[in-house]
Curated annotation (Swiss-Prot):
Family membership noted in the UniProt record: Belongs to the TRAFAC class translation factor GTPase superfamily. Classic translation factor GTPase family. PrfC subfamily.
Highest taxon listed in the record's lineage: Bacteria
Protein name: Peptide chain release factor 3
Pfam families: EF-G_D2 (PF22042), GTP_EFTU (PF00009), RF3_C (PF16658)
Biological source species: Teredinibacter turnerae (strain ATCC 39867 / T7901)
Amino acid sequence: MASSQLAKEIAKRRTFAIISHPDAGKTTITEKLLLFGNAIQLAGSVKGKRGPHAKSDWMTMEQERGISVTSSVMQFPYKERVVNLLDTPGHEDFSEDTYRTLTAVDSVLMVIDGAKGVEDRTIKLMEVCRLRDTPILSFINKMDRDIRDPVEVMDEIEDVLKIAAAPINWPIGMGKEFKGVYNLYTDTIHLYEHGQGHTIPEDIQIKGLDSEEASALLGAYAEDVREEIELVRGATHEFDLDAYHAGELTPVFFGTALGNFGVREMLDGFVEWAPAPLDRDTAERKVAADEDKFSGFIFKIQANMDPKHRDRIAFMRVCSGRYSQGMKMRHVRLGKDVKIADAVTFLAGDRSQVEEAISGDIIGLHNHGTIQIGDTFSSGEILKFTGIPHFAPELFRRIRLKDPLKTKQLQRGLQQLSEEGSTQVFFPLNNNDIVVGAVGVLQFEVVAYRLKDEYKVEAIYEPVNVNTARWVDCSDDKKLAEFKRKCSDNLALDGGGHLTYLAPTRVNLSLSEERYPDVAFRATREH
């Protein structure tokens, strides 16, 4: 394929993830998007997570609990575009994987529960999006229920998430009185027809808010609705494509995912406005998405994707060029050329061999323990993609063995699980404890389960007096040595051998930062 043809193909790609607070409707929206992209024929309501529809749950523990702990990847075609959707665990407990998945996308869809507004998980995920000024499109969900005043929800997005919000459409009524949405840019009313499961309701439109049909539909409410729309126009931001691409403004759509309404309009806007694959920074140079030379990085490693094989799949975001079956690529960290004949692509748990993939696509490489998160692969050039960080854990436990003779297996298991990003492990300098850190409680359960299942090690967790962790470094060796001497009780080495400060309280961390101004305390660490 000639370069111009490759550039055309790349321009069609839209790679994004959905962020939301648990139960805001993310899984339902994911299903409806796949439905519009003809990727699934039946949108089974997600309440039946253990049913045959639960395409993305394949670790046994997930199947037992009916939650998606692992991020899946789904690709579907829509309106001459190719959409790559990276699913992020939305359960009450999520993990660092969720954060890292956001480093592999070009834009994000934020789903907000219209009744609850902006919730704390959304705030956290938004902070990660801010690291790269990721463009964000918003969908305010559950309009067929009684929700908060839409103006209030918009204000909350602006105040709490510090981003301008530009409504593209506006709801007419809500709950039982929900009539549909009015598009502020096309002067069209889209009538609400409830579509369930795999039925896509017909898009019934009325042109013109001042038309006779609109008056007939709205009856006694007609004047109120027109006044409200006037006020909304005056009081909200107008959509601006450049501001959206810069991560400064979010276009907002209203609808109901369960009622299958408003998702199509949102998807139409998304494929039209969301950026195609973006250029990426490496330590050496900027890599353009439409370069001929192949490059990509690993953002996630998933064990046991196939219970029959103890394999681990490394998820790679292709950043430039093209992957084709059987090609050679350079594993930069190891300085080795590897031939990749069996990369896989995914429809949530269905694995199929991939013939080729281009910039913006996600492929899975079989990993026998040699690939780590953050690894760069290229067509030979020495490159190291940046911006794929470790995030400081927020929860900590000491880990103890039921059988002390299995220390070796425990250390090997923890080493592998930390390389994979399932947990972070810390070895304090002054004692023989092993401390594990995580972003969500569920990560601890996953680690205990997998140590037992894969490494035959039974471990017990105990509370430990650690509130937060920071990676530390200092350019002045003398000052670093003094810091290490005075603070050795709080220092540990992480799984990669990096010096880490384990703070018992936030106050302790603040005092240490003040006391040692030459030491950098970092909440993230590049891989």
